[in-house]
Structure formats: structure tokens, C-alpha cells
From Swiss-Prot:
InterPro entries: Ribosomal_bL28/bL31-like_sf (IPR034704), Ribosomal_bL31 (IPR002150), Ribosomal_bL31_A (IPR027491), Ribosomal_bL31_sf (IPR042105). The gene is rpmE. Zn(2+) binds at C16, C18, C38, C41. Signal peptide: none annotated. Belongs to the bacterial ribosomal protein bL31 family. Type A subfamily. GO terms for biological process: translation. The keyword RNA-binding applies. This is Large ribosomal subunit protein bL31. Part of the 50S ribosomal subunit. The keyword RNA-binding applies. The lineage of its organism: Bacteria, Bacillati, Actinomycetota, Actinomycetes, Micromonosporales. Binds the 23S rRNA.
Length: 74
């Protein structure tokens, strides 16, 4: 095996945009990683799921293209 073929595996601080931080090990250089979501703020882990208003989106679509159909019918 070649010497020095594996990257250095160091302790790394992970910081989330919500303010949560934790320590893990990684090959990332610099010793710190910044993430947008983590298990403390992600809806899957917290149980706070957002409901998308799909009915409103469909109504907007139909309203938008009803105008096009009205023009074609003239």
C-alpha cells in the first residue's frame, strides 16, 4: 500500500444556521462545517411539518389559464 494515501481524519465542529453545534469526525479541511439544517431544526425530526396549500396553487393555475381559454373561444 502507498504511504499517506488516506486523508487525515480529524475532529470537526458542525455548526447549523439555527445555532445548534455538535462535534464529529471528518476529512473536511479546516475543522469546521456550516450547514443550513440539522436534526434539531429539520421538520422531519422535530415533527413540525409545513402543509403546502396545493388547492390554492391549482386554483391559481386554473384562473390563469381560464383567461387563455376565454381568448381562444372568441
Amino acid at each position: 500500500m502507498k504511504p499517506n494515501s488516506h486523508p487525515e481524519y480529524v475532529t470537526t465542529e458542525v455548526a447549523c444556521s439555527c445555532g445548534n453545534t455538535f462535534t464529529t469526525r471528518s476529512t473536511a479541511k479546516g475543522g469546521s462545517i456550516h450547514v443550513e439544517t440539522c436534526s434539531a431544526c429539520h421538520p422531519f425530526y422535530t415533527g413540525k411539518q409545513r402543509v403546502l396549500d396545493t388547492a390554492g396553487r391549482v386554483a391559481k393555475f386554473q384562473q390563469k389559464y381560464a383567461k387563455v381559454q376565454a381568448k381562444k373561444g372568441k
